[in-house]
Amino acid sequence: MKQITVALAGQPNVGKSSLINAISNAKLKVGNFSGVTVEKTEVVFTICDEFSCENYETHIIDLPGAYSLTEYTIEEKVTKSFIQSDEYDIIVNVVDSTNLQRNLLFTTQLLETGKKVIVALNMSDEAREEGIEIDEKQLSKILGVPCIKTAASTGEGIDELKEAIVEIYHKKETTAKVIYSDPIEEEIQHIVNFLKEKHYRSKLSYRLLALKLLQEDADIYRKMHDEPIWIEILPLVRDALGHLYLHHNTKDLKEIFEEEHFAFAKGAKMEVMSTKSMKAKNLTQKIDILLINKFLGIPLFLFFMWLLFQLTFELGSIPMDYIDTAFSWMGEQAKL
């Protein structure tokens, strides 16, 4: 039986654990990631591919929730370290469908890793209740990876997710893509053309390699430093970076690519997501709409503060009267 290892990645509170629990006949293993006390959750189950009549032992590693591939927290450090390793075959990026744009910021970083990625648009049922509609097919075209609507609470999309895992597993390389602004795309293309001209052999696609060179990826720089092509490509990369610094008016590459990720996530969201007004709203939503109204919000706040003040003294006077009476009676008794 073939084994598929899946890294389950996503921001905090996107329903990763619920999605794991929704997988039938799951066997849960709990431990720690190597060298740290962060809990490691692993699920083992079997996927039966109906087309090939073959079974796959699938291991899902639930990575700690992270907002980005940085090392600001121990959870992000663990997630980044695992994502950069070769200990898995596929990334399943769990996304909160009710907060698409913010979640896509993390998705763009995962797409840049060069790994095989599947996007699970989780909490789709909650999104529909809020009037949010996402065109998952269009999003799949934009990202270059499968995008599947899931709802852990109802089991929606679980079978489709399993099928996608097997399908992506058999693909030789990822088709993930992130589209950048014209200046960056032009510099990427210049480097790609140079690599093609030199027939450079790389495990990464030329586009991904060019991107990592522009991002000054330490591992790529270390690997290519001792290769003959390094002397020729370094001036090209430096010129490209000079153009980017000039265009973005900063030499902070982190800031440059954060802006690019934000623009890409915002553009993708605007293209695939629509929101319709919901006629039926629950009590909480109705109260929220009333309290955050730009005209009524502040007056209502002041009214409730006044009401709280009045209730504190009016209601508080009742037990105080009883207490005063009790102490007066006790005082009288003491005099006897």
Regions found by a protein language model. Give the residues of each.
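Conserved G1/Walker A P-loop phosphate-binding module
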Residues: 1-72, 85-86
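Conserved C-terminal guanine-recognition region of P-loop GTPase G domains, centered on the G4
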Residues: 45-52, 78-147
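Signal for well-folded cores of large energy- and translation-related assemblies
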Residues: 24, 68, 83-84, 111, ...
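Residue-level signature of catalytic and energy-coupling elements of molecular machines
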Residues: 19-20, 38, 60-62, 79, ...
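Extended helical scaffolds that flank P-loop GTPase cores
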Residues: 173-336
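Short flexible coil/turn linkers enriched for glycine and charged/polar residues
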Residues: 1-2, 13, 52-54, 113, ...
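Conserved nucleotide-binding/hydrolysis micro-motifs of P-loop NTPases
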Residues: 35, 65-66, 97-100, 123-128, ...
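Canonical P-loop GTPase G-domain recognition
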Residues: 125-179
